[in-house]
Amino acid sequence: MRGFAAVLMGAALCFAHPCIAQMGPPDANPVPGMPGFAGPLAAKYGVDAAKILEAAETDEDGYAALTYLCDHVGKRLSGTPQLNTAVAWGAELMRKAGLQNVTVQPVMVPRWVRGSESAAMMYKGEAGPITRPLHMLGLGMSVGTPAGGITAPVVFVSTFDALDAMTPDEVKGKIVVFNPGWHGYGVNTQYRTFGASRVAAKGAVAMLVRSATGLAMQIPHTGTLVYDAKQPKIPAAAISVEDALMIERLCKEGPVTVHLQMDAHMDADVQAGNVMGEIVGSEHPEQVVSIGGHLDSWDVGQGAQDDGSGIMAAYEAVTLIHKLGLKPKRTIRLVFWVNEENGGAGGRAYRKMIGDKIGEQVAAIEMDEGAEKPLGMGYGSAGGPRRPRTPAAGAQSADASALSPQIQQSLAAMQDIVSLLGPIGANTVTPGGGGSDIEPLTADGVPALSPRTTGAHYFDWHHTEADTLDKVDPVEFRKNAAMLSVVTYVLADMDGRLAGRKSGGQ
């Protein structure tokens, strides 16, 4: 990377120093997903970007902090002592790094307790009845079963449409097992999130759902659910891909029964806190670029990719700027939000703290997709999905010309900025992006951004016992940090601002 940085620095010196009003070619009409083009921002910030890329190549502080977080704090579910340990540790980490105005914003978070849990299916075998344990994880915020568990016949359902076509008599008193296949996280999580109440409306006593992953390794993936207040709360759990497929096969042959036991329950809310530290702006300290991820995790694995890698890459991004002595005009605020996984209380509290000063929020950057090989940045205010997904066959790319002139100009500015990231292969920008923690900001018009990575394995480990430090490659981690650092610094220092749009508007 160092050689590329030197080339970039030399090329930058050949450019003039134009103003931000000329953010791209006069007829620029950015095409979503296309590589960036070098323009006035690349000319102005090429030297500083090269310094950041070179420093990031050898900086080990971020990965060292991630290692400590994973190995010495561990899983960090909201409401647990481990999360509050992480909050205190995170604040001290920022102080030692020399960030200013380090504070912990109090946030009340839910306390969901998993307790003991198990599941087994019973069906007819060649030599007699077979009882086979299921690989399961209760879904976050689920209620538990009655004492002794629930034993009930299974009804297999592939989709919500198939469920809607069933009569209540076909579902009442049964355990519904969903296996919609794998169509990407956004599709599959609809079943995990809303399936329990959908089947409860027809009288089901519990729900099991195929884990939201395309990888079959007998590993269940947890995640949160949301109950419909109008329906009874029934217990719900995720099962492995293999178990879901086997139940589907067996249900075609004859009766299948499942015994489900879950001690899950809610305790009283617990105080935690968003951790914040800043590089105060040299000219416009009241204007803020927020960058971060979520400090909490599920109660399985180490929360390494989700989202330890995100917060520590953001930490390294900000501290690189500080170490290099760069002085952005605006304030850069590093935020470790809490309770992203099962409530979103941290993001809402952060928005409430900002209050009527929302217009001073210049941009919000959230990293919550893992730290695999970086490809570039997503610009959520230009529309598109939060998470990148493969388009359907024959689908047409979004027409950038349909966007407002302000959004088009901002897309051009982002293409200009990401052109600085060519040395690490992260020089693309796509419409889409954002995150749960910054959604309360972006809903009120703050420009939303998030890293785009290959994401080749993220959902193999996501919300499982396998989300451990060894899944985070140190080289790719540093590239992500470098990408975030360059983008954050330019957004905090450039003369103009990206355009945002409120929810439902352009």
Describe each PLM feature range.
Residues 64, 72, 319-345:
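Short helix-loop-beta-strand segments that form the rim/entrance of peptidase-like active sites
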Residues 5-18:
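Bacterial N-terminal signal peptides
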Residues 319, 323, 459-506:
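His/Asp/Glu-rich mid-to-C-terminal helical/loop segments that flank catalytic regions of hydrolases
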Residues 39-80, 217-224, 296, 368-372, ...:
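N-terminal capping segment at the start of a domain
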Residues 49-57, 71-82, 118, 141, ...:
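Second-shell loop/turn segments in exported
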Residues 46-48, 124-125, 136-168, 225-304, ...:
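Soluble metallo-hydrolase cores and metallopeptidase-like ectodomains found primarily
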Residues 24-45, 67, 71-175, 181-182:
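Noncatalytic luminal/extracellular "stalk/propeptide" segments of secretory-pathway proteins
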Residues 234-239, 244, 251, 284, ...:
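Metal-dependent peptidase/peptidase-like ectodomains
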